[in-house]
């Protein structure tokens, strides 16, 4: 049986080292990319880098890191669907059981290069699949997440559903910041290309 896996990719690194350490102590594997992976490795945390799972290095100045079937398949597979699990096995993809992502505060320094695509995609994928996957977007939740995993062996369905709601609120807020930025550029950009 595979270990439980958490994918960590955070802008706000508050508490992430302790969180990862606790997960490892509970038998979890940590997957990470970019600045989060570097931060964890520098702190002595054993990390499986996303590039190891995808077989592809990040590209386009970091615009493409986690947008890959080996990541999203591992997040989106319905664990109660035998065909999903068989397909993952046939493709050599392992499940990802917990996605920990928080997004760059776009309103603080807006611009095209700071629009995150992969982060929101992972958050939304995990939230969609809350029956199988937990998603954490708030560092203040790390302690309660660890406590619940330690006590119950995993997150309850109720907790995963609450976290999914928080996740969709997080991505909605992020998207609203981007819309606001475009609204400020209204004179420069057309409302529609049609």
Regions found by a protein language model. Name each.
Residues 1-53:
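N-terminal glycine-/serine-/threonine-rich phosphate-binding loop
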Residues 1-2, 21-23, 64-69, 89-95, ...:
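Solvent-exposed alpha-helices and their adjacent loops that cap or buttress functional pockets
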Residues 2-5, 25-28, 43-46, 69-72, ...:
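Short coil/turn connectors at secondary-structure junctions
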Residues 3-8, 13, 19, 59-62, ...:
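ATP-dependent carboxylate/acyl-activation modules
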Residues 8, 29-34, 49-52, 77, ...:
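General beta-strand structural signal in soluble alpha/beta enzymes
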Residues 35-106:
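Glycine-rich nucleotide/cofactor/substrate-binding loop typically near the N-terminus or early
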Residues 98-110, 117-158:
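A short, charged helix-loop
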Residues 140-148, 152-194:
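Active-site loops and adjacent core secondary-structure elements that bind or stabilize anionic groups
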């Amino acid at each position: 049986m595979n270990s439980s896996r958490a994918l960590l990719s955070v802008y706000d690194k508050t508490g992430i080292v302790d969180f990862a350490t606790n997960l490892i102590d509970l038998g979890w594997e940590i997957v990470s990319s970019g600045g989060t992976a570097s931060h964890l490795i520098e702190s002595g945390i054993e990390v499986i880098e996303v590039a190891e799972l995808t077989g592809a290095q990040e590209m386009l100045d970091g615009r493409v890191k986690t947008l890959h079937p080996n990541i999203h398949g591992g997040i989106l597979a319905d664990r109660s669907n035998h065909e999903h699990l068989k397909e993952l096995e046939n493709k050599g993809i392992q499940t990802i059981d917990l996605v920990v992502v928080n997004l760059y505060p776009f309103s603080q320094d807006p611009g095209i290069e700071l629009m995150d695509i992969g982060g929101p995609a992972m958050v939304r994928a995990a939230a969609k699949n809350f029956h199988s996957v937990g998603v954490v977007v708030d560092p203040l939740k790390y302690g309660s997440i660890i406590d619940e995993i330690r006590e119950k062996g995993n997150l309850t369905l109720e907790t995963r559903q609450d976290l999914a709601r928080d996740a969709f609120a997080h991505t909605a807020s992020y998207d609203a910041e981007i819309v606001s930025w475009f609204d400020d550029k209204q004179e420069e950009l057309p409302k529609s290309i049609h």
